Regions:
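Hydrophobic alpha-helical segments typical of transmembrane helices
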Residues: 67, 104-105
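Active-site acid/base region of carbohydrate-active enzymes
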Residues: 2-18, 24-25, 31-49, 53-83, ...
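TPR repeat positional signature
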Residues: 105, 174, 178-181
Length: 181
């Protein structure tokens, strides 16, 4: 463990402890989304959003290096990246989730300063960006209508009966595309 936080606020301290325990429960062989349910899948969106925090809390460089190798093996020939690694759902290319191909190696590099993960992941990173460029219907934007994007997933401002937040899907995808570039 590398990251510690103690404050004068018991609620904040408990929150931080819960984040630590969440990482312990979810980082076994792949970064899973939740250990308490039968699902326990390696959702790429969960991994990319948590990678920076994971690297602050633990020496997660080897863990993510191994997982990025798994991700690269799961990537499709067209460069699209699965939403789950290992790919047991046969779904790929969703914005935010597929961007794990770029965001995870970048955050690991930023945390530990070793560019090897970038070198090892470069082909997959480039493949992901090429996939967007080759399949988009609008130059310089991420408009891949054939892919079921999740968007602003589990936002509090979602419509009744939906898990997708009110943030426009095109905006979310464009922001991820810009960040990944």
């Amino acid at each position: 463990r590398t990251g510690y936080l103690t404050s004068g606020n018991a609620l904040l301290n408990k929150f931080f402890d819960n984040v630590i325990w969440g990482q312990r429960g979810n980082f076994l062989d792949v970064p899973t989304d939740c250990p308490q349910r039968d699902e326990r899948l390696g959702w790429t969106g969960d991994a990319q959003i948590f990678a920076k925090t994971a690297c602050y809390q633990y020496d997660a460089e080897k863990f993510f290096t191994k997982w990025m190798a798994d991700l690269a093996l799961s990537a499709r020939l067209d460069g699209s990246v699965p939403v789950v690694v290992p790919d047991v759902l046969d779904l790929s290319g969703a914005c935010g989730w597929a961007d794990a191909a770029v965001i995870v190696p970048w955050e690991v590099y930023r945390a530990f300063g070793d560019a090897q993960i970038i070198r090892d992941s470069f082909s997959c990173m480039k493949g992901h960006l090429d996939y967007i460029r080759n399949t988009t219907s609008a130059p310089d934007l991420w408009r891949v209508e054939s892919v079921p994007h999740y968007g602003d997933w589990l936002a509090l401002d979602h419509d009744e009966g939906s898990y997708r937040g009110a943030t426009p899907l095109a905006y979310t995808c464009d922001c991820y595309y810009a960040y990944s570039l």
